[in-house]
Design a protein with these regions (language model features):
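DPxDG-like acidic metal-binding loop motif
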Residues: 58-89
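N-terminal beta-alpha supersecondary unit
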Residues: 1-61
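Short, well-ordered secondary-structure micro-motifs
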Residues: 16, 101-103, 121-124
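Conserved small/polar residues in nucleotide/adenosyl-binding loops
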Residues: 133-139
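Beta-strand/loop-alpha-helix module characteristic of Rossmann-like adenine-cofactor folds
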Residues: 111-132
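Conserved phosphate-binding catalytic cores of ATP/NTP-utilizing and phosphoryl-transfer enzymes
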Residues: 91-110
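Stable alpha-helical structural segments in soluble proteins, enriched in small hydrophobic residues
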Residues: 45-49, 84, 102
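Short glycine-aspartate micro-motif
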Residues: 3-5, 60-62, 70, 109-112
Length: 143
């Protein structure tokens, strides 16, 4: 079975299909029409990967921080997709996902996300075996 990972938290709609390894990704600039672009991106990536939507067993969704309206649209669309397929929707904190991707096992990590209008969210992490732990709680700052 396959997993679908989605982010609508920023300027781009990003979609990925993976199992034990990454199979396919797509990233599209979202100026307007996030709902249509998200559904189109999911359709295109499943076709490109030759995977039926019914073969997807879980959806991981970036729940922010990020662009408020885009996050709400992503959540609404994916609740519908997961409900129709009868599969779980797993929320993923965007700052934590960035820290996990950058994890080296020996360095502190600071993740920063632009959340619009000169506002940024950030969090500091310290390494622990195989993962990381928060040094600070996620924080929002206006520049």
């Amino acid at each position: 079975m396959y997993s679908l990972s989605i982010s609508t938290s920023g300027k781009y709609i990003s979609v990925a299909i993976h199992d034990d390894k990454l199979i396919s990704t797509s990233s599209v600039l979202s100026e307007n029409g996030t709902t249509n672009l998200l559904m189109k991106s999911i359709d295109e990536i499943t076709k490109k990967s030759r995977i039926e939507k019914s073969d997807i067993s879980v959806v991981y969704l970036d729940i922010g921080p990020g662009y408020y309206t885009s996050l709400r649209i992503g959540l609404a669309v994916e609740q519908g997709v997961c409900g129709s397929l009868g599969i779980p929707l797993v929320p993923v904190n965007g700052l934590d996902a960035l820290a996990f991707a950058a994890h080296t096992g020996h360095r502190k990590i600071c993740t920063i996300i632009d959340i619009k209008r000169e506002e940024y969210a950030f969090c500091l992490y310290k390494p622990v075996p195989v993962s990381y732990t928060h040094l600070t709680l996620p924080t929002k700052r206006i520049v």
